[in-house]
Design a protein with these regions (language model features):
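N-terminal amphipathic alpha-helix/helix-capping segment at the start of soluble metabolic enzymes
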Residues: 1-23, 27, 113-127, 133-134
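Active-site mouth loops of central-metabolism enzymes
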Residues: 17-33, 79-81, 131-157, 202, ...
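Hydrophobic faces of well-ordered beta-strands that scaffold small-molecule active sites
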Residues: 19-23, 48-50, 75-77, 92-94, ...
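Catalytic cores of alpha/beta
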Residues: 35, 77, 81-95, 194-225
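Glycine-rich phosphate-binding active-site loops on the catalytic face of alpha/beta enzymes
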Residues: 50-55, 91, 95-106, 174-179, ...
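Alpha-helix-loop-beta-strand connector modules within alpha/beta enzyme cores
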Residues: 60-83, 113-125, 182-208, 238-239
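Conserved anion-binding
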Residues: 84-165
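Glycine/Thr-rich beta-alpha phosphate-binding loop at enzyme active sites
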Residues: 143-188, 230-236
């Protein structure tokens, strides 16, 4: 039974914040896999996201399979394209890149994914995906050939997020990008959170417990940590 989205909404209603660890299959150190698993198990993470911008479907499937065997947390696909699917995952963030105007990432990749998704028992969670300027060009920007929303364009971020909600997005994701120089601005998180009714995800450029807490305090319901954990698997050790 598909229950993840219902749980996310219930947590939002009850003010329960959630932390997700994003794992990129291309960047996993398999020689240190056991220690990575232990680090995740001892972290405050509630979710595992699997994805990135450029890797193969086989790498995604391999990582999801290993995670499901080792860790008792929901594993959610965060696909960079229509081929990055894995039957063993619990759910998929069905992303539409609303901040850009490239039709391939607004709708074409989604259409291409449908035949495979119809054969899988995945919980499909429509997600309005907004790329926010982070101080340098990110892989998402390069691959999607789109420009991010500027850091001072708070109204544009708010209106884009709300448009996504009106169109049916069940989640809104504000993304600074992998290895971002700067995280999503606090005033932007706050403004978007105050405008939408669906759960808000914030990720990219968050490298300390203080920054994570600031994002939560500004209204993020789910915060995603990727590069910080990737570079230091003991990132959560002092929490």
């Amino acid at each position: 039974m598909h229950q993840l989205y219902a749980q996310l909404c219930l947590n939002k209603a009850n003010g329960i914040k959630q932390l997700a660890i994003l794992l990129d299959p291309e960047k996993i150190n398999w020689e240190a896999w056991e220690s990575t698993v232990q680090a995740i198990q001892h972290s405050p993470a509630n979710l595992i996201l699997v994805g990135g911008s450029s890797h193969s479907p086989l790498a995604v499937t391999q990582l999801v399979q290993k995670l499901k065997k080792a860790i008792d947390l929901p594993v959610v696909l965060f696909p960079g394209n229509s081929a990055q699917l894995a039957a063993q995952a619990d759910a998929i963030l069905f992303l539409s890149l609303l901040s850009g105007r490239n039709p391939d990432y607004l709708i074409q990749q989604q259409v291409d994914a449908v035949p495979a998704l119809m054969q899988l028992d995945l919980e499909v969670i429509s997600t309005g995906y907004l790329l926010i300027d982070s101080g340098h060009v990110t892989s998402v920007e390069r691959i999607s050939q789109t420009k991010p929303i500027a850091r001072n364009q708070v109204d544009l971020a708010v209106h884009t997020a709300k448009a996504g909600e009106y169109l049916g997005s069940k989640l809104v994701y504000l993304e600074a990008g992998s290895g971002a120089q700067f995280p999503v601005p606090i005033d932007m998180i706050q403004a978007v959170s105050n405008t939408i009714a669906v759960p808000l995800i914030v990720g990219g450029g968050l490298r300390s417990q203080r920054e994570i807490q600031a994002a939560f305090d500004a209204g993020a319901d789910i915060v995603v940590i990727g590069t910080a954990f990737e570079e230091d698997p003991q990132f959560f050790a002092s929490w």
